[in-house]
Design a protein with these regions (language model features):
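Conserved N-terminal entry element of GNAT/NAT acetyltransferase domains
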Residues: 1-23, 156-176
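Conserved acetyl-CoA binding element of GNAT-fold acetyltransferases
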Residues: 86-98, 235-251
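Conserved catalytic-core motifs of GNAT/GCN5-like acyltransferases
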Residues: 125-128, 145-158, 297-310
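Conserved beta-strand in the GNAT
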Residues: 66-68, 74-82, 89-94, 214, ...
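Active-site rim helix/loop that mediates acceptor-substrate recognition in acyltransferases
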Residues: 3-8, 25, 29-80, 192-213
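Amide-forming acyltransferase catalytic core, primarily the GNAT-like/NAT-type
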Residues: 141-241
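Conserved acetyl-CoA-binding loop-helix of GNAT-fold acetyltransferases
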Residues: 92-95, 101-115, 123, 137-141, ...
Length: 325
C-alpha cells in the first residue's frame, strides 16, 4: 500500500536507493505514519496506527528485504518486501509528503522487483487504495493488475469456550517445532504451490509479537493462524490481528475455518484482548461470507493487485485470511 495521490512524474531529483539500516528505523516509522495519515486526512497525521508497528517488525524479520530512498542524505521513503515461499508482496511503501509525485516510489519498487526475481516468486502482489485510479495506474506500469477487493474486518472478542482442539506454537517443545513448521508448510503448499509461512511463524516467535494458533484433528494439523497481539506489533493495543490464517481445502473447509476462528478468538481472550482483526479477499467468497455471518464487519477495504494477472490463492473454495498490507 502506498499513500500518494498522483501519478509520479519524471523527476530531476538525485534519488539514492539503498538497504534500510537499523539507524533509519525511527525516521522511516515517522514517514510511514505521516504519509498515510496525510493521505487519509487525519488531523494529526503522525498518529496514524497508534502504537501498532509495521516498520521495525518487518525490518527485523528480514533486513535484506527493506529499502530506503534518500535525497541529499535525507531519508525520504522506504519499502519492504515479504517472501511467503513462492508468494511475494511489498509494502508499506511510503514517502514523505514533501517528496510525493517526484519519482521516489518508482525507484523504491525497482529493488523489490529484483528481489522477487531472485526469490523465484511465482505470484506477487500488493494491497492499495481501491478508490485511487492513480495508484492503479502506477502499479500497472510494473505489471500489477487490480483484481478483487480485500476487506479488513474486525469484531469484538467473545470469551467463550467452544471445545475446539487447538494449541499454539509457543507451547510446543523446541524439539517438535521443526516438525510443526514442516506440517504448516505442507498445509499451505496444498493451497498454493510453494506457499510457505515459515518466515512469519518464526518472526512472531523470535520477536514475541504474538503466537501461531495450530488447529488439530487428532494428530493431523488442519489449520494455522499467525497472530500479532497488542502494542508494538502490527495489531496495536487491545487487538489480535490475524496476519495469516488458513485451513485445508475440501469438504471440511467451512467447519475447520469456523474452528480456526474459534481458536484465534480464544487465544486472544486468554490475552485479555478486546478486538479480533483479520483481512479476507472477497474472491474467497465462502470465507468472506462466513466471516460476515460470524459478526465481522469491514473497517477498511482496498484492492489487491497481482502479477501475473491470475487468481493465485484468491479463489472460491479457499478458506484463508490475509491482506498483503
Amino acid at each position: 500500500m502506498k499513500p500518494e495521490s498522483k501519478i509520479e512524474e519524471s523527476s530531476s531529483l538525485d534519488i539514492n536507493v539503498r538497504p534500510l539500516q537499523e539507524s533509519d528505523l525511527d525516521a522511516a516509522d515517522h514517514i510511514m505514519r505521516l504519509a498515510f495519515g496525510t493521505f487519509i486526512g487525519l488531523p494529526e497525521p503522525a498518529q496514524f496506527m497508534g502504537d501498532a508497528d509495521y516498520v521495525r517488525t518487518r525490518w527485523r524479520a528480514n533486513p535484506s528485504a527493506a529499502f530506503a530512498a534518500e535525497v541529499e542524505g535525507r531519508l525520504v521513503g522506504s519499502n519492504f518486501a515479504t517472501r511467503w515461499g513462492t508468494v511475494g508482496f511489498f509494502g508499506p511503501l511510503t514517502i514523505h509528503p514533501e517528496f510525493w509525485d517526484r519519482g521516489v516510489g518508482k525507484r523504491l519498487m525497482e529493488p523489490v522487483g529484483d528481489l522477487f526475481a531472485q526469490w523465484g516468486t511465482t505470484h506477487a502482489g500488493l494491497f492499495t487504495f481501491a478508490h485511487s485510479q492513480k495508484h492503479a495506474g502506477l502499479y500497472q506500469k510494473f505489471g500489477f493488475w487490480p483484481r478483487f477487493l480485500t476487506a479488513l474486518m474486525s469484531k469484538p472478542i467473545e470469551n467463550k469456550s467452544s471445545g475446539v482442539e487447538w494449541s499454539t506454537f509457543s507451547q510446543a517443545p523446541p524439539a517438535e517445532r521443526e516438525n510443526i513448521i514442516n506440517a504448516c508448510r505442507q498445509l499451505t503448499d496444498s493451497i498454493y504451490k510453494g506457499l510457505d509461512l515459515t518466515s512469519e511463524i518464526e518472526a512472531v516467535a523470535k520477536q514475541k509479537l504474538g503466537d501461531t494458533v495450530l488447529l488439530w484433528k487428532g494428530d493431523q494439523l488442519t489449520g494455522i493462524a499467525v497472530c500479532h497481539c497488542g502494542p508494538g506489533t502490527e495489531a496495536g493495543s487491545g487487538t489480535c490481528y490475524v496476519k495469516f490464517g488458513a485451513v485445508r481445502s475440501g469438504e471440511s473447509g467451512e467447519a475447520d475455518f469456523e474452528r480456526l476462528l474459534d481458536g484465534c478468538e480464544q487465544m486472544a481472550a486468554n490475552r485479555n484482548l478486546s478486538r479480533l482483526f483479520a483481512g479476507v479477499n472477497t474472491a474467497r467468497h465462502e470465507a468472506y461470507r462466513q466471516m460476515l455471518a460470524r459478526g465481522f464487519r469491514t473497517d477498511i477495504q482496498g484492492v489487491v493487485m497481482s502479477k501475473p494477472n491470475e487468481a493465485g490463492y484468491n479463489r472460491p473454495g479457499v478458506y484463508l485470511i490475509d491482506d498483503w498490507r
